[in-house]
């Protein structure tokens, strides 16, 4: 049996759904699942210190291979002793492969069997990223969990295109496995693609499972499809993945999508959503979305969320936070970002308890009753 650096331990299955309570063991510690992972694109979660992230219960964070390759460079980070030392974070780190960022540069990229040529968004220079290069960068970064280089096809692309794409992604995954220099202390995940086509998802999953990765990601979702379409893809994709390995749904952070992903057997999630909307003064609360910059909060001396015990809600009022944001004070963004991240990390803590109590469906109903059933129409 292969001795993986990343191990999944199942603690309990929920009786009424596909949800599972567990933990993932990594070279930099163990974290409970299901877990939401804050995104630290440039080796920092925007405006948050490592100490603040630990205080809110973030057991793992994500960093971005593409951005760190371009700046400051993966070789510089390797000289610093790896990403953990560079950013002073002693807990697990997951890095993506750069594939999604290249996907988002659709107007300036060219995909071949060898890899992807694209324009550097910082200076316009021509760049080339291959499966081997994506693995080499992540080996230099030293993350605990790495991602295979993949193409993320658009959800509504034609069947023939998506079929060719997933077959190439499988070949890229095999090349990445061969290029992996540190399988003893970095776990490489395969990424299942296939857009909304069940047979292609099945083909992609079968290819990757045969390669025996330490964990598996479900990619190509949260890219414009409806909430119902995402759930349908998870319904037929998650059961294809091994029960004894972690399952990661990439790029998902809306509260209803997190709960629905857990119900379908997902263990890990990430998204820039909580910090991105926080910078515009949009806050997640137990009673739904709150835009604290609105004029009606100018004299509101209550917390962002009466049911939240985070640092922001324990110490500051809506009126004060609104003032900071209107005055372009960074501290305001720090407070809203901390609150939103805490909200999702704490939501997952409640979800884990609901799995333990076998009442996840009741928890979902109660949560959405207060939060609002139309969350999927809010981009939130």
Curated annotation (Swiss-Prot):
Cofactor note: Binds 1 zinc ion per subunit.
Active site: 96, 270
MF annotations from Gene Ontology: metal ion binding; tRNA-guanosine(34) queuine transglycosylase activity
Substrates-to-products reaction catalysed: 7-aminomethyl-7-carbaguanine + guanosine(34) in tRNA = 7-aminomethyl-7-carbaguanosine(34) in tRNA + guanine
Cofactor(s) for this UniProt protein: Zn(2+)
Keyword tRNA-binding among UniProt keywords: no
InterPro entries the record matches: ArchSynthase1/Queuine_TRR, TGT, TGT-like_sf, tRNA_ribo_trans-like
Region of interest (RNA binding), residue spans: 251-257, 275-279
Keyword Plastid: no
Pathway this chain belongs to: tRNA modification; tRNA-queuosine biosynthesis
Chain positions recorded as Zn(2+) binding sites: 308, 310, 313, 339
Chain residues that bind substrate: 96-100, 150, 193, 220
EC code: 2.4.2.29
Listed GO CC annotations: cytosol
Record keywords, A-Z: Glycosyltransferase, Metal-binding, Queuosine biosynthesis, Transferase, tRNA processing, Zinc
GO biological process: queuosine biosynthetic process; tRNA wobble guanine modification; tRNA-guanine transglycosylation
Function: Catalyzes the base-exchange of a guanine (G) residue with the queuine precursor 7-aminomethyl-7-deazaguanine (PreQ1) at position 34 (anticodon wobble position) in tRNAs with GU(N) anticodons (tRNA-Asp, -Asn, -His and -Tyr). Catalysis occurs through a double-displacement mechanism. The nucleophile active site attacks the C1' of nucleotide 34 to detach the guanine base from the RNA, forming a covalent enzyme-RNA intermediate. The proton acceptor active site deprotonates the incoming PreQ1, allowing a nucleophilic attack on the C1' of the ribose to form the product.
Subunit and interaction comment: Homodimer. Within each dimer, one monomer is responsible for RNA recognition and catalysis, while the other monomer binds to the replacement base PreQ1.
Family: Belongs to the queuine tRNA-ribosyltransferase family.
Name of protein: Queuine tRNA-ribosyltransferase
Record organism: Streptococcus uberis (strain ATCC BAA-854 / 0140J)
């Amino acid at each position: 049996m292969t001795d993986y650096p990343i191990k999944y331990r199942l603690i309990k299955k929920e009786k009424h759904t596909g949800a599972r309570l567990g933990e993932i063991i990594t070279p930099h510690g163990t974290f409970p699942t299901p877990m939401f992972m804050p995104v630290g694109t440039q080796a920092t979660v925007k405006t948050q210190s490592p100490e603040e992230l630990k205080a809110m219960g973030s057991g793992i964070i994500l960093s971005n291979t593409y951005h760190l390759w371009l700046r400051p460079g993966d070789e510089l980070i390797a000289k610093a002793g790896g990403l953990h030392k560079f950013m002073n974070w002693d807990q697990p780190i997951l890095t993506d492969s750069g594939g999604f960022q290249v996907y988002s540069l659709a107007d300036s990229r060219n995909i071949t069997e060898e890899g992807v040529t694209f324009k550097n968004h910082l200076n316009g220079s021509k760049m080339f990223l291959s499966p081997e290069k994506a693995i080499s960068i992540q080996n230099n970064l030293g993350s605990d969990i790495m991602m295979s280089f993949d193409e993320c096809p658009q959800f509504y692309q034609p069947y023939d295109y998506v079929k060719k794409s997933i077959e190439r992604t499988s070949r890229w995954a095999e090349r990445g496995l061969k290029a992996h220099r540190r399988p003893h202390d970095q776990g490489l995940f395969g990424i299942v693609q296939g857009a909304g086509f069940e047979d292609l998802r099945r083909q992609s999953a079968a290819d990757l499972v045969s390669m025996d990765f330490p964990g598996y990601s479900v990619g190509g979702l949260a890219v414009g499809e409806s909430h119902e379409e995402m759930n349908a893809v998870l319904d037929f994709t998650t059961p294809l993945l091994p029960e004894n390995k972690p399952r990661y749904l990439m790029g998902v952070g809306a509260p209803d999508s997190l709960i629905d992903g857990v119900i379908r057997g997902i263990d890990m999630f990430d998204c820039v959503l909580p910090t991105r909307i926080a910078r515009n003064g949009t806050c997640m609360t137990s009673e739904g979305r709150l835009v604290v910059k609105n004029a009606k909060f100018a004299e509101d001396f209550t917390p962002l969320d009466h049911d939240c015990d985070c640092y922001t809600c324990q110490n500051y009022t809506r009126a004060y936070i609104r003032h900071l944001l209107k005055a372009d004070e960074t501290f305001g963004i720090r407070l809203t970002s901390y609150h939103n991240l805490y909200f999702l990390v704490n939501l997952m803590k409640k979800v884990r308890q609901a799995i333990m109590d076998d009442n996840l469906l009741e928890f979902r109903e109660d949560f959405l009753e207060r939060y609002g059933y139309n969350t999927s129409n809010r981009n939130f």
